[in-house]
Amino acid sequence: MAGNEEKLLDYLKRVTADLRQTQRRLRDVESAGHEPVAIVGMSCRFPGGVRSPEELWELVATERDAVSELPTDRNWDLDRLFHPDPEHPGTSYAREGGFIDDPAGFDAAFFGISPREALGMAPQQRLALEASWEAIEHAGIDPESLRGSRTGTFIGCDHLDYCSDASQVPEGSAGYFTIGNSASVVSGRVAYTLGLEGAAVTVDTACSSSLVAMHLACQAIRQGECDTALAGGVAVMSSTAPFIGFSELRGLAPDGRSKAFSANSDGMTLAEGVGVLLLERLSDARQSGHRVLAVIRGSAVNQDGASNGLTAPNGPAQQRVIRQALTNARLTPSDVDAVEAHGTGTTLGDPIEAQALLATYGQDRAEDRPLWLGSIKSNIGHAQMAAGAAGVIKMVMAMRHGVLPASLHIDAPTPHVDWNAGDVHLLTEAREWPQGERPRRAGVSSFGISGTNAHLILEQVPEEVAGAARGGEAEPVAVVGDGTTPEEPVAAAADGTTPEEPVAAAADGTTPEEPVAVVGAVEGEPVGGPVPWVVSARGTEALRDQARALADRVTADPEVTPAEVGWSLLRSRTLFDHRAVVIGQNRQELVAGLEALAAGEPHPALVHPAQATDTPDTSGQTVFLFSGQGSQRPGMGAGLYHRFPAFTEAFD
């Protein structure tokens, strides 16, 4: 009997151990499915000359209006396009919008793309490629280190109107035009060029494309389909078709201003841009020591279904997608402080969205913690497939600065909303964003004209992660400028024509807004020994441009220390063949060396300046190196020198 009891006891112990192990595995699986996704890098181009997340933040923080007149460099017949009568066919009653600078500029040589192929590439493909490279560098990661990795590419993009018919195909681009004008290839082009082997997916759900792309990227990361992912969206108006089409729908604001949730709202502002994020699991970011800008706690996507119309917003569907995102994030509505709204400024869509927010986030809130509501479309317009990315980047920067920026053009809240139905307030002026007892959190909404809705919830970086980069050392600094300049103009203009004087617009990298001081932050103060800054590029002129950009960056931000810059240049950027090294004891010496390199002049702080000055390029010549050690036998080099006149003559 005793033996049977012992056997039963052993059996029960084994079963209990197996049960506990199974429970642990289930918890691990469930935890992985809800693990926050870290945003470790960001890049963007938006109206107002914005070329980085920091510049986008400066634009919204200073309450700038980036809307401008229709561009004159896209071969558009502006006189024929504009007509004040909305009933006039084939015209636009709006003549302003949000446009990025130089959409035709592209450094094809940097990416190993031939001039002919570049001519056949739509601007969306070029911008997505540049922005993806920049996002990786912004994370302090060498893009070449991701080659062959399980990195996914999820890019929102719709129909490419680079060339609407065969007569507009740029001369010399035959054989490349079909692929270069395919939206499906936008993500594939990035993956191919950078050697990324995760899923490459182009998302087209209209205005919600970039947020849907981020949702899919988060799912792929949590399910283990990829380890890291690029996610975002891109939109460029190469033709006047969007203005004509939305004028026919009466969807544009006559004065070109999106007045989100305002009593005088009268339509949206068409805009363009690109925004890309680099994402990875929060646990992986911790382990790798990557700087985390913010985390994505949860997200959701749904569809309007059968509603009042194909393009009409559906309030109940918007409420459902918000609640689904909160469930995915394991949060309640009162846990979220603010929402970056879809808010385009239309008289139909804005009231429906506001009522959905009032019914969800506006309920059961503390009296002193209303939901704050804003829209970046009041600054830059509706960037279409990149709109969600713009909203996410804005809110990430707002979290890091502790400020909720104001929305523009709100004289009074729209009377078509019952604002007493919940505790939601418009951001008519900038407000401090206190952290309180919990991290800052924000929702971001995007609703597509296709009926596809997306909502994403951002959270401030956990404190234990914020200071954990590189074992508690300074965060890496990505320095502006990728050091590339094409030797020959290769890019066609946004409308398919070749510009007379194309300007190269190389990927320009960015810098974190809060660098951590290490040593030598004071102007002219010694940094504890010589500090080397390794500058590299693909060509001689590009090397000068890189030096100039770096000098400007360091001069503009004295808080960035020489040690941080040196570390970042050496460890987090690709080292190209054309290189120079600036060595200095302090910031003044280092900047002086950079300025000399940019000017093509010698300087005591500049090492190996020959390839960066006006001396002939000697790259590719064979060099014999005699180390003095004798690779086969002692004194081998000396013996060759003394015995063979040919070696003696060549060596001397």
Q: Can you annotate each of these PLM segments?
A:
Residues E58, A356, A542-D545, A592, ...:
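Short, solvent-exposed alpha-helical surface patches in well-structured domains
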Residues A2-T16, R45, P313-N328, G443-D495, ...:
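Flexible catalytic loop/linker elements that gate and position reactive groups at enzyme active sites
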Residues R14, L127, A131, D545, ...:
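A non-catalytic, amphipathic alpha-helix used as a structural packing/dimerization or gating element
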Residues G298-S299, Q303-G309, A592-A596, P602, ...:
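Acyltransferase
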Residues V186-S187, H608-D652:
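Helix-rich "cap/lid" substructures immediately adjacent to catalytic or cofactor-binding pockets
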Residues A61, D101, R222, S247, ...:
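Alpha-helix boundary recognition
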Residues A2-V477:
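Condensing-enzyme catalytic core of the thiolase-fold
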